[in-house]
């Protein structure tokens, strides 16, 4: 019996770490992402912050910078040119989505209960990230608030539906929170937390600095696993108590 209790104590110490590791430094299962993160030399421009540990390839980082990204068969110019600052924020958001290895706590299957392709859901972007993105795009034009669904595919590429005219971003996204959360169908969540709080992710950071999102992913990975461990380990403990 003493040996079993020693094993249990070891599980209490080790299981949270082992389980948490599954949510840290991982890539989602998709056609564009690598199977696992690792160094990538010469990522293109806005994707450079992830060169030390990336889920994207150099080719993907280059495609993220095209006016009509091959990644999504979609033109950011569907209502004319975005302002340079607005376009830069979108490229940074694409790089973050494609390259970051710190999105594990928010990875979910595209199809409920499915085991194949995955997406991220509700990634908490820092307040400044949403505000800066919104200000940069305030005067640019778009015809939709959700860029993932509801497009006209009659010409094999996404075009504005006939009944949805081009209007300023401020019409479709009255607040920074609206932009962050609606634009990619809840891929991102507008966090009330600010940068360096350890409770929100930055969609971009200076390539010369360490990745601030590692600490944040660690925090949320622990939070996500706490409910599971709170049932599993006590249940095992009870079994030992009644073990003859």
UniProtKB/Swiss-Prot annotation:
Its main location: membrane. Residues 1-19 form the signal peptide. It is a lipid-anchor; GPI-anchor. Belongs to the folate receptor family. Receptor for IZUMO1 present at the cell surface of oocytes (oolemma), which is essential for species-specific gamete recognition and fertilization. The IZUMO1:IZUMO1R/JUNO interaction is a necessary adhesion event between sperm and egg that is required for fertilization but is not sufficient for cell fusion. The ligand-receptor interaction probably does not act as a membrane 'fusogen'. Does not bind folate. Changing residue 185 to D: Reduced stability of the protein. The keyword Signal applies. Coiled coil: none annotated. A lipid is attached at residue 222 (GPI-anchor amidated glycine). Glycans are attached at residues 73, 185. It is found in: Cell membrane. This is Sperm-egg fusion protein Juno. Residues 62-81 are annotated as: Important for interaction with IZUMO1. The protein is rapidly cleaved following fertilization, being only weakly detectable in zona-intact fertilized eggs at telophase II and undetectable at the pronuclear stage. Sheding is probably required to block to polyspermy and ensuring egg fusion with a single sperm. Was named 'Juno' after the Roman goddess of fertility and marriage. GO terms for cellular component: membrane; plasma membrane; side of membrane. Disruption phenotype: Female mice are infertile and eggs do not fuse with normal sperm. Both male and female mice develop normally and are overtly healthy. Male mice are fertile. Despite infertility, female mice display natural mating behaviors, as assessed by vaginal plug formation and the presence of motile sperm in the reproductive tract when paired with fertile males. They respond to hormone treatment by ovulating morphologically normal eggs at numbers that do not significantly differ from wild-type. Disulfide bonds join 27-55, 47-95, 56-99, 79-166, 86-137, 126-200, 130-180, 143-160. Changing residue 97 to A: Does not affect ability to promote sperm-egg interaction. Monomer. Interacts with IZUMO1; the interaction is direct. IZUMO1 and IZUMO1R/JUNO form a complex with 1:1 stoichiometry. Interacts with WDR54. The lineage of its organism: Eukaryota, Metazoa, Chordata, Craniata, Vertebrata. Keywords: Cell membrane, Disulfide bond, Fertilization, Glycoprotein, GPI-anchor, Lipoprotein, Membrane, Receptor, Signal.
């Amino acid at each position: 019996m003493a040996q079993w209790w020693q094993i249990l104590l070891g599980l209490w110490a080790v299981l949270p770490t082992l389980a948490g590791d599954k949510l840290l430094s991982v890539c989602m299962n998709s056609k564009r992402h690598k199977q696992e993160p690792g160094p990538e030399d010469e990522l293109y421009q806005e994707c450079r912050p992830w060169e030390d540990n990336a889920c994207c390839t150099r080719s993907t980082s280059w495609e993220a910078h095209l006016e009509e990204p091959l990644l999504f068969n979609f033109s950011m110019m569907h209502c004319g040119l975005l302002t340079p600052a607005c376009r830069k924020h979108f490229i940074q958001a694409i790089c973050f989505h494609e390259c970051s290895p710190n999105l594990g706590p928010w990875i979910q299957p595209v199809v409920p209960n499915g085991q194949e392709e995955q997406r991220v859901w509700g990634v908490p972007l820092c307040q400044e990230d949403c505000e800066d993105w919104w200000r940069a795009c305030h005067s640019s034009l778009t015809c939709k608030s959700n860029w993932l669904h509801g497009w006209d595919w009659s010409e094999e590429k996404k075009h504005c539906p006939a009944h949805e005219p081009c209007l300023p971003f401020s019409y479709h996204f009255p607040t920074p929170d609206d932009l962050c959360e609606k634009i990619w169908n809840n891929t991102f969540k507008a966090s009330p937390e600010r940068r360096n709080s350890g409770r929100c992710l930055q969609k971009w950071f200076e390539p010369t600095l360490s990745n601030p999102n590692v600490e944040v992913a660690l925090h949320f990975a622990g939070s996500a696993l706490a409910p599971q461990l709170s049932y599993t380990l006590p249940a095992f403990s009870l079994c030992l108590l009644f073990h003859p």
